[in-house]
Amino acid sequence: MSKLSGKVAVITGGAGGIGRAAGKLFAEAGAQVLLVDINEKALNEAVNYISKDKVSYVAADTSEPDEVKRFVDEAVRLYGGIDIFLANAGIEGELNLIIDTPLEMFDKVMAVNVRGVWLGLKYIMPEMNKRGGGSIVITSSTAGVRGSSMMSPYSTSKHAVIGLMRSAALEGSGMGIRVNTVNPSPIQTRMMRSIETQRLEVGGQTFSTVEDIQEATAESSPLKRYGEPEEVAKLMLFLASDDSSYCSGGVYMVDGAVTAGRTS
């Protein structure tokens, strides 16, 4: 039997990168998958890429309560309930010093990266409780376990969802709901490309091209490379499945030992 046979998974930020990779892996493992993203064109492409038979989508803003209620209701209408929630929607914001970051940018990042996750938990946990439990996986980041210069809103948000995860893991324990975070970086995604492009723009003469930044980033990793979205998705599949039945409240790094320390 497939790992997720008979399960229903909701994946936010599902139109590309890690979310799309997880959607494909979850569907291949037997789950019915509802992808959620604000980009409807990319969602349609993701569904065609994965499987029209196993995957549906809802275009929604995950930071708005009515929008979250709408995609939760749609998952229940289509599939009868929710067993797995991958809270993956997130934005990086604009790179800047704290003193130069507009309050509006801070609020925007926190709305998507923290409020959106909290709303998902608020409306999905009751549905999981009706089915006797479930698994929630929240995408954090290496920026959630250490500081990140020029990215204070993003780093703050990724620290915050770890605290949120731990609270949800405690509250969910009585409902049979497990909650964990996955903390990736550097991963070959659109968000990573955006961060690298912004670093080039604000980095003065340190780097000449985005390729220079990518080379330096890969070289700084103990494994000397970027991770791929599929490598992150494989851990998410483990945490979503019953194979991880005693895993809850955990922070799982997918970073090629970047946060482990220095090699020399």
Feature map (PLM): residue ranges:
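Short C-terminal tail/terminal secondary-structure segment
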Residues: 3, 92-95, 236-237, 248-264
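Canonical Rossmann dinucleotide-binding motif of NAD(H)/NADP(H)-dependent dehydrogenases/reductases
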Residues: 3-34
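Substrate-binding pocket helix/loop in short-chain dehydrogenase/reductase
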Residues: 96-98, 102-108, 217
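Active-site helix of classical SDR
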Residues: 121, 157, 165
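Alpha-helical segment proximal to the catalytic Tyr-Lys
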Residues: 126, 170-171, 245
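Residue(s) in the substrate-gating loop at a strand-loop-helix junction
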Residues: 141
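Short, small/polar-rich loop/turn modules that mediate ligand/substrate recognition or access, typified
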Residues: 173, 178, 247-249
